[in-house]
From Swiss-Prot:
One Pfam family named in its UniProt record: LYTB
Protein name per its UniProtKB record: 4-hydroxy-3-methylbut-2-enyl diphosphate reductase
The encoding gene: ispH
Matching InterPro entries: LytB/IspH (IPR003451)
Organism field: Campylobacter jejuni subsp. jejuni serotype O:6 (strain 81116 / NCTC 11828)
Residue positions binding [4Fe-4S] cluster: C12, C92, C186
Length: 277
């Protein structure tokens, strides 16, 4: 059986930057998980004493706080700045961009449509920068019964599929006078999604490695599953089952943007140890 990695996969720029920052700072607390990968979060806690707190209210005697890659709300940031604590911002620059756009467009009188999951921490943070009105949607159908204003700005959660974003944009163009569209989908998302599509079309089994709470990993899995029925989403090599690979000729592997190479290599090694001819 051939084992092939996607052309683009794994750690993105923003995650690499955050991990490096956390390792250098040490002895700190992150507000929410730094990234969506439980194994890497455990490694940072064990080796660098970087612990995870659920929210700002959980801070007690910590001297250093790291803002997660997904960012935090504007209100939480203001609250954090009032505390006697050193702040290190690990928000991904691709996430900071829609925050800034929302703030500026609001000042100019635009209401904002955010294409994304309203429960995702990134989207909560982005929405908090809107001072007019924000509409968080996952489908154009959610906009059909809304009385839209004459001026709308549109941004996307960084990990969403571009074609779905364009469905929202095309709907709005037909419904309102002025639409300002900002492409806030991360470049790494484009590349990883294109790569897994290409690989899954020629594979008869696919393994996607990443946190099951990771939005970008779930998107990769959905693309793989569309093209390759026998696609599996795992967090570690412990979840692999030999029967997945029996009678298979081509195994494709990809990984989410928060998945470190050391986990991916363990997955490959275990699949190789199954010794599927």
């Amino acid at each position: 059986m051939i084992i092939e990695l996607a052309k683009n996969y794994g750690f993105c720029f923003g995650v690499k930057r955050a991990i490096k920052k956390a390792e250098q700072i040490k002895d700190a607390a992150t507000i929410g998980p730094l990234i969506h990968n439980n194994e890497e979060i455990s490694r940072l806690q064990k080796n660098f004493n970087v612990k995870t707190l659920e929210n700002i209210q959980a801070l007690s005697n910590e001297k250093k706080a790291i803002i997660r890659t997904h960012g935090i709300t504007k209100q939480d940031l203001e609250e954090l700045r009032k505390k006697d604590i050193e702040i290190f911002d690990a928000t991904c620059p691709f996430v900071t961009k829609p925050q800034q756009i929302c703030e500026q467009m609001s000042k100019e009188g635009y209401e904002v449509v955010i294409f994304g999951d309203e429960n995702h921490p990134e989207v909560k943070g982005v929405k908090s920068y809107v001072s007019t009105k924000a509409y968080v949607v996952l489908d154009k159908k959610e906009l059909q019964n809304i009385k839209l204003p004459n001026k709308i700005a549109v941004v996307s959660q960084t990990t969403k599929k571009p074609e779905h974003f364009m469905e929202i944009v095309n709907f709005l163009i037909l419904k309102t006078k002025e639409v300002r569209v900002f492409n806030t989908i991360c470049d790494a998302t484009f590349k990883n999604q294109d790569a897994i599509k290409e690989l899954s079309l020629k594979s008869d089994v696919m393994v996607v490695v990443g946190g099951k709470n990771s939005a970008n990993t779930k998107q990769l899995f959905l693309i793989a599953k569309t093209n390759c029925e026998d696609s599996y989403l795992i967090e570690t090599e412990e979840e692999l089952k030999k029967e997945w690979f029996l009678d298979k000729k081509h195994c494709g592997i990809s990984a989410g943007a928060s998945t470190p190479d050391w986990i991916i290599q363990k997955v490959i090694a275990k699949i190789e140890n199954f010794k599927i001819n």
